[in-house]
Amino acid sequence: MELIRGLHNLKNHSSCVVTIGNFDGVHKGHQKILNKLVSLAKKKGVPSLVISFSVTPEAFFGRTKAKLSSFRDKHLFLESLGIDKHLLIRFNREFSEVSAESFIGDVLVKRLGIKHCLVGDDFQFGKGRRGDFAMLKKASHRMNFIVEEVEELNLENNRISSSAIRGLLLKGDFRQAEEYLGRPFTISGRISHGDKRGRTIGFPTANIGIRRKISPVLGVYSVVIKVRDEEHVGVCNIGKRPTIGGSKVLLEVFIFNFNEEIYGEYVSIIFKQKCRDEIKFNSFDELKDQIKQDVETSKKYFKGENYLT
């Protein structure tokens, strides 16, 4: 899949089929649109193109939400679905002033040569969010392209959305979140050197820096760790580590029965069960005792799920 970073790197296209959105998490609702896009592109013999944004419009205007997926993971998910091109638009002050009419005429029609556009039923775009399906439909008659609204996807009468998934993760309902996502909730990243405090209390951890300012999960969890195409189990803490006065969100994972050198490795942390919220302890001895309990809680969980520990 070709990644086009910014409109300044976009070469004019003669034709393509397009969808537009944030696609945070690339959940089943998104997949419904994306699968239809790929099918349409093959039928018409033109490229499928997804437009997404460097930051969400909500985040740009100060309404930051916890991201379900990193840009890297989102890009890989799109690629796995068979998307041909991914246009990443830098959402900045200048772009926020682009009217919906200009976006249709200058970007979709002139630059992309749009033939068919798929949008979700709640889609809005352009300055002041003035653009919607009705505006696209009206423009399509004048500018010779087809626009189609894809209905929401529901599971047991509940709308599948990124917001709904955030709510499930907050409650620790990973089974339902997996149903909505179409795969387990996962955070991926590169193992970095930490302060090695865990070693001093008998629980050496692998550390992953979390770039997102707000995490959709906070606390202690039973997790599966994928490293070098192998799966291991363990317990992780994601939070600011209040016992030592931490200020940045960090993911630390203690992998059971594992002592290999993995600094610099790219790993995936698959969340299975919430053990507890993050707590500020009065001493490292209290913290050590609680970690022992967390380890036992996780081992019992994995034994019940028939994972080897």
Regions found by a protein language model. Give the residues of each.
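Short acidic-hydrophobic, aromatic-tinged amphipathic segments that line or gate anion-handling sites
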Residues: E2-H8, L87
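N-terminal catalytic cores of NTP/NDP-binding nucleotidyl/phosphoryl-transfer enzymes
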Residues: N9-S70
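Residue-level signal for inorganic ion chemistry
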Residues: H27, L78, C117, A177, ...
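Glycine-rich, highly charged phosphate/nucleotide-binding loops
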Residues: K65-K74, V98-I104
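A glycine-rich helix N-cap at a beta->alpha junction
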Residues: D73-L87
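Classical nucleotidyltransferase
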Residues: E97-P204, R228, N282-E286
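Phosphate/ribose-recognition catalytic cores of enzymes acting on nucleotide-derived substrates
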Residues: M143, G194-T309
